[in-house]
Amino acid sequence: MANDPLEGFHEVNLASPTSPDLLGVCDPGTQEQTTSPSVIYRPHPSTLCSATIQANALNLSDLPTQPVYSSPRHLNCAEISNISIHVPEPASSVASEVAAGLTRFTSRKDSCNAEREFLQGATVTEASAGNDDIFGLSTDSLSRLRSPSVLEVREKGYERLKEELAKAQRELKLKDEECERLSKVRDQLGQELEELTASLFEEAHKMVREANVKQATAEKQLKEAQGKIDVLQAEVAALKTLVLSSSPTSPTQEPLAAGKTPFKRGHTRNKSTSSAMSGSHQDFSAIQPIVKDCREADLSLYNEFRSWKDEPTMDRTCPFLDKIYQEDIFPCLTFAKSELASAVLEAVENNTLSIEPVGLQPIRFVKASAVECGGPKKCALTGQSKPCKHRIKLGDSSSYYYISPVCRYRITSVCNFFTYIRYIQQGLVKQQDVDQMFWEVMQLRKEMSLAKLGYFKEEL
């Protein structure tokens, strides 16, 4: 079985992956071997040339044991057409077998020629497309076997696209987060701007209101200060008058003008009847004593004043002021309306009391609180029905109290005393020594004593 010939081995090589064809046979005459580039497996030339070739028959011993790879050659159509198969002349002993074999071989040759023509057409087609390699199909098959498959390429491309898509999605997510963060920042800045604007407007309105209130308060204080200035100017003028009148250098009596006789009270007697008594009258006037005003300070009171002068204070508990409070101030400001009298004393001490002349103000313009406190026909301190030419105001109160002339004089005498000792406390009295200050205080106490006894001066 092993030596049985195999027919058609030159056409199909079972060991070849590319199904090569045997296109050339060794010529015994020239010993030239023509091998087609498409033949991958071929028998050795020595075997083909030495052995007798039987038509369409091969022995197993003639098969190659190793694959023979032909070097790549670039053949054109002309070379392919010149390829021929040379068969040696058969021996005479086997003429009959050769004839039958030739018949079969001729049919095989025709089929090979048809296959060669088909390959030539395919080669020409590839050459017209720009490919000169006659073994393009074989090379492409090998390249497909060596290169990755289409599925792997697609999978790699799909993976790369997935990676790029994931990267783009990550970038888009980052962009969205950045946009969201910027939107939050924008909203926060807008809210802060609105709050700041609202606070600025509120602060501006608050400042305007405060400015208006301060302006109104300043105007009110200005009016009150102007009223106080007028009152103080009147008090200063009164104090100047008191100082000038109590000064020892001021004349107490002006000399009579020349040629004028002094006014005599009573009736005049007849000259005839009075001439007899003239001598006795002159003797009586001669023996009448001359009277002058004299003064002497109380030593204890003077020492108390000197002690107070060294450290002046408005505290009523000090010995000097306590005695004046008990002897002059309290009796002078004691009225039937005790509550109002206490308020008047407190206002005098705080220097917040103001006195205004009523003038010819109609009753319809008088405030209701002032009318309730007595009105211009009734004194608010004594409760007596007397014409009231002045009214007082206590501190920042809007109420006015109408007072009679005697009450007004009693209040002004106490105000004059407090004004003078305030000047001493503030160091404004510098032109007088301690004795002059003491006697000025005594003069003010005298006025308070006269006022509490009912003596007063009224302006006509």
Curated annotation (Swiss-Prot):
Question: Where in or outside the cell?
Answer: Cytoplasm; Nucleus; Cytoplasm, Cytoskeleton; Cell projection, Lamellipodium
Q: Which Gene3D superfamilies match?
A: 1.20.5.4880
Tissue specificity field = Ubiquitously expressed. Expressed at highest level in testis.
**Ranges that cross the membrane:** none
**GO molecular function annotations of the record:** GTPase binding; guanyl-nucleotide exchange factor activity; identical protein binding; small GTPase binding
Q: Which UniProt keywords apply?
A: Cell projection, Coiled coil, Cytoplasm, Cytoskeleton, Guanine-nucleotide releasing factor, Nucleus, Phosphoprotein, Protein transport, Transport
Pfam annotation, one family:
Sec2p
Transmembrane among keywords: no
Q: Does the keyword Nucleus apply?
A: yes
Q: Where is this region: Disordered?
A: 246-280
State any GO BP term from the record. Answer: protein targeting to membrane
User: Where along the sequence do coiled-coil regions lie?
Assistant: 149-244
One Gene Ontology cellular component: perinuclear region of cytoplasm
Primary localisation category: cytoplasm
Fetch the InterPro entries from UniProt.
RAB3IL/RAB3IP/Sec2, Sec2_N
The chain residues annotated with the modification Phosphoserine are: 147, 149, 247, 250, 272, 280
Q: Where is the composition biased (Polar residues)?
A: 271-280
Could you give the subunit structure recorded for this chain? Homodimer. Interacts with the N-terminal region of SSX2. Interacts with the GDP-bound forms of RAB8A and RAB8B. The interaction with RAB8A is prevented by phosphorylation of RAB8A at 'Thr-72'. Interacts with the GDP-bound forms of RAB3A and RAB3D. Interacts with DCDC1. Interacts (via the N-terminal region) with TRAPPC14; this interaction mediates RAB3IP association with the TRAPP II complex. Forms a heterotetramer with RAB11A where RAB3IP homodimer binds two RAB11A subunits.
Q: What does this protein do?
A: Guanine nucleotide exchange factor (GEF) which may activate RAB8A and RAB8B. Promotes the exchange of GDP to GTP, converting inactive GDP-bound Rab proteins into their active GTP-bound form. Mediates the release of GDP from RAB8A and RAB8B but not from RAB3A or RAB5. Modulates actin organization and promotes polarized transport of RAB8A-specific vesicles to the cell surface. Together with RAB11A, RAB8A, the exocyst complex, PARD3, PRKCI, ANXA2, CDC42 and DNMBP promotes transcytosis of PODXL to the apical membrane initiation sites (AMIS), apical surface formation and lumenogenesis.
Sequence similarity: Belongs to the SEC2 family.
What is the protein name stated in its UniProt record? Rab-3A-interacting protein
Taxonomy-wise, where does this protein's organism fall, top ranks first? Eukaryota, Metazoa, Chordata, Craniata, Vertebrata
